[in-house]
Design a protein with these regions (language model features):
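Flexible, low-complexity junctional segments that flank or bridge functional domains
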Residues: 2-268, 275-277
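Bilobed periplasmic-binding protein/Venus flytrap-like ligand-binding cleft at the lobe interface
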Residues: 62, 332-333
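Short, solvent-exposed amphipathic alpha-helical segments in soluble enzyme
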Residues: 258-261, 288, 333-335
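Hydrophobic "anchor" residues on beta-strands that sit immediately upstream
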Residues: 268-270, 318
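Short hydrophobic alpha-helical runs that function as membrane-insertion/retention elements
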Residues: 270-271, 299
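Gly/Ser/Thr-rich loop/hinge elements
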Residues: 277-327, 331
């Protein structure tokens, strides 16, 4: 009888533990994966659902949220009261949602944090420029740019009549970034994107000729979604593998696993995470497991111990990084 009672107690305890685990998983799933919890509606600043009389109160709420959640301003020696007062004075004078939206964009960018973003939609040509040795170039133009007369390797020397360096300097105030080089680079990449402009003039240098092209910038849904590979591989000189990891956003893990077998047995491997703006931290961690030799703590969370994969790379690794390597991509390089 005593044995039966003990068994009964054990069963009850096990059932209670299982019930607790189930409840925990249920709460976790509902809190973190319920779309209603994370649903966000994005707007073009010209279409913000606000009237001028609402600007000041809306901006006050934004500032309060920042103060409650952004403790890093102290380490960056930011005078938040001064920043708020300077922006608030301009908010009171704003007449349109475009005026107001650009002030908010400046405020967020002044936080000097690449993770602090407004999520405003931008008009675009769906094209990134090449920024090489502080020069702007058209790089493999898409059909839309080609239609308006752009050609590969055109050098952009002015935007809207401003020399391109001056244009970058004037627009850096709208760019979210943690460092000065990163801010400049990201601003250069915005040559074909804008929060407010729907039309831009570009002065191009092509060979020995100078020409001007007027280009409408479109809403993002004008362009079809192209599924670009997040990881690319190639082999140099028969013995050097080259992996370009463009992002840590999904589906990077699936793309990585598809190309990794092509390079895993080569004696040398170059991993290029330049221009990788980050994404999901766990993707960076899981990819890193293929390039470590022994268990080690994750650089961000020391309590998380990374274990090397069974088929982890055993050759010599060269890692390429730059001032645009950010967030999950940066922690990947540190690991």
């Amino acid at each position: 009888m005593k044995i039966l009672k003990k068994i009964s107690k054990v069963i009850v305890i096990v059932m209670a533990v299982l019930a607790t685990i189930w409840c925990g998983l249920y709460v976790y799933a509902n809190y973190f994966y319920n779309d209603k919890q994370i649903d966000v509606e994005n707007f073009y600043i010209a279409e913000l659902p606000l009237t001028p009389s609402q600007f000041e109160e809306d901006f006050k709420e934004i500032h309060q949220i920042v103060m409650e959640n952004y403790s890093l301003y102290q380490a960056k020696h930011l005078n938040m009261d001064s920043l708020y007062q300077a922006c608030d004075a301009r908010v009171r004078q704003a007449q349109t949602t475009t005026d107001y939206g650009l002030i908010v964009q400046e405020y967020i960018s002044a936080l000097q944090c690449a993770h602090a973003i407004t999520c405003y939609k931008r008009y675009t040509a769906n094209q990134r420029v090449a920024f090489i040795e502080d020069f702007l170039f058209v790089d493999k133009p898409n059909d839309y740019l080609t239609e308006y007369g752009f050609q590969d390797k055109d050098r952009i020397i002015a935007i809207n009549g401003l020399p391109y360096k001056q244009w970058i300097e004037q627009n850096e105030k709208y760019t979210e970034a943690s460092t000065v080089p990163h801010r400049r680079l990201r601003t250069a990449y915005d040559a074909f994107r804008s929060y407010a402009d729907t039309l831009r003039n570009y002065t191009l240098l092509r060979g020995g000729d100078t020409l001007t092209v007027t280009l409408p910038l479109k809403q993002r849904d004008y362009f079809p979604d192209n599924e670009e590979q997040t990881v690319e591989s190639r082999i140099l000189q028969d013995s050097i593998g080259y992996l370009t990891i463009k992002t840590m956003m999904n589906p990077v893990m699936e793309d990585f696993k598809a190309v990794y077998p092509k390079v895993k047995d080569l004696p040398y491997l170059i991993i290029d995470v330049r221009r990788n703006g980050g994404g999901n931290s766990m993707n960076g961690v899981n990819i890193c497991k293929y390039f470590i030799r022994e268990a080690q703590p994750h650089c961000v969370s020391k309590s998380y111990i990374m274990q090397p994969e069974a088929d982890a790379y055993k050759g010599k690794i060269y890692l390429l990084t730059d001032t645009y390597t950010l967030s999950a991509a940066e922690s990947f390089t540190l690991d």
